[in-house]
């Protein structure tokens, strides 16, 4: 009896290991080596050209990748035109330059006869994300490929799937852990806010109406409050965009974490990473060592790129990223 029980436990353990490695085994670097060997160069050139037109290309593409992966997995469902995920309020603020970056890169890839209709929009978005990180001074990293494009994109599927500006650490960890991402991964990915921007309407409560007894969030730097009030005065258009990193907003560096140490996190969900003792040591580590942040970011963005992917014969290779075939 004990022997059979041991065999069953071992079999179940082996099955779990097999399932957990399944996605990463199907995604791999060099996936298009035979079908479209120059895909990475083609995407790189297209993204660089778009980036030269507007810096917004970088934060917009990064945010687009994150939003895509957290809703139905990294399947480019965010790219599908309305009615779709893009109709949800959490996605309506996504900058058009992110979508345009993927469209331009897809056009460049498909203009090569050897590559036409062979590379998924999901993979192009993953590659474009790496390129904007590099273009802003961040680390380069190998991108696993082999994703297929999803056929489903609905407004309802976005509900409660994306982190909110007022989230506390428990809420952040809970949401990220559902996708196999650790607290360290979450903090590293939050570091991408170093080149991010946000709209006045998303943070004004912290500086004008934080609580019934306290107008200003006590965790926010008072000098930073003055700056924010100048950029987002009462009555301003809530869509006005401001940088999330007030020191080096166009450079992918560890300044975001140094800002948190000074109380200069734009969102509650940013500043909580430092004010909560459970995550403070990681923030301090990344603030003290850009190398530590860069390595953690590479690990986290790679894991993010594996979330909910479609591979093999699942999904499709979309001819037009904005609509299913």
UniProtKB/Swiss-Prot annotation:
Q: Which residues form the signal peptide?
A: 1-25
Q: Which residues form the active site?
A: 67
Top enzyme class, one word, equals oxidoreductase
The UniProt record gives the binding positions of substrate as: 163
Q: In which tissues is it expressed?
A: Slightly expressed in roots.
Q: What induces it?
A: Up-regulated transiently by a cold treatment. Induced by methyl jasmonate, a plant defense-related signaling molecule.
Q: Which residues bind Ca(2+) 2?
A: 194, 245, 248, 253
Q: Does the keyword Nucleotide-binding apply?
A: no
What EC designation does it have? 1.11.1.7
Task: Alphabetically list the UniProt keywords.
Answer: Disulfide bond, Heme, Hydrogen peroxide, Iron, Metal-binding, Oxidoreductase, Peroxidase, Secreted, Signal
Known catalysed reaction(s)? Answer: 2 a phenolic donor + H2O2 = 2 a phenolic radical donor + 2 H2O
Q: Name one GO biological process term.
A: hydrogen peroxide catabolic process
* PROSITE patterns assigned to the protein according to its UniProt record, in alphabetical order: PEROXIDASE_1, PEROXIDASE_2, PEROXIDASE_4
Q: Where does Ca(2+) 1 bind?
A: 68, 71, 73, 75, 77
Q: Which cofactors must be present for this protein to function? A: heme b; Ca(2+)
According to UniProt, where does the site described as Transition state stabilizer lie? Answer: 63
What the record says about family reads: Belongs to the peroxidase family. Classical plant (class III) peroxidase subfamily.
General remark: There are 73 peroxidase genes in A.thaliana.
Question: What is this protein's name?
Answer: Peroxidase 45
The species this protein was found in: Arabidopsis thaliana (Mouse-ear cress)
Q: Mind giving the lineage of the organism this protein is from?
A: Eukaryota, Viridiplantae, Streptophyta, Embryophyta, Tracheophyta
């Amino acid at each position: 009896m004990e022997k059979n029980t041991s065999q069953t436990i071992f079999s179940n353990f082996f099955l779990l290991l097999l399932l957990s490695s399944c996605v990463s085994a199907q995604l791999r670097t060099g996936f298009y080596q035979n079908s479209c060997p120059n895909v990475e160069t083609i995407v790189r050139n297209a993204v660089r050209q778009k980036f030269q037109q507007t810096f917004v290309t970088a934060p917009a593409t990064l945010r687009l990748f994150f939003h895509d992966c957290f809703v139905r997995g990294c399947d480019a469902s965010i790219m599908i035109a309305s009615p779709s995920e893009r109709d949800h309020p959490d996605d309506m603020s996504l900058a058009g330059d992110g979508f345009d970056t993927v469209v331009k890169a897809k056009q460049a890839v498909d203009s090569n006869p050897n590559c036409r209709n062979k590379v998924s929009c999901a993979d192009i978005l993953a590659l474009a994300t790496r390129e904007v990180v590099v273009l802003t001074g961040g680390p380069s990293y190998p991108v696993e490929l082999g994703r297929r494009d999803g056929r489903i994109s609905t407004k309802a599927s976005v509900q409660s799937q994306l982190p909110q500006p007022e989230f506390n650490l428990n809420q952040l960890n809970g949401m990220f852990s559902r996708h196999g991402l650790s607290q360290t991964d979450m903090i590293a990915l939050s570091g991408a806010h170093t080149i991010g921007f946000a709209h006045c309407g998303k943070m004004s409560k912290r500086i004008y109406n934080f609580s019934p007894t306290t107008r200003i969030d006590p965790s926010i730097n008072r000098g930073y409050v003055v700056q924010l009030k100048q950029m987002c005065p009462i009555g301003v258009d809530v869509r006005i965009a401001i940088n999330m990193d007030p020191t080096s907003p166009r450079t992918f560096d560890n300044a975001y974490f140094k800002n948190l140490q000074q109380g200069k996190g734009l969102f509650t969900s940013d500043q909580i990473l430092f004010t909560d003792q459970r995550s403070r040591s990681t923030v301090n580590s990344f603030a003290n060592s850009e190398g530590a942040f860069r390595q953690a970011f590479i690990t986290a963005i790679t894991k993010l790129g594996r979330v909910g992917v479609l591979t093999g014969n699942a999904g499709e290779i979309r001819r037009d990223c904005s609509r299913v075939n």
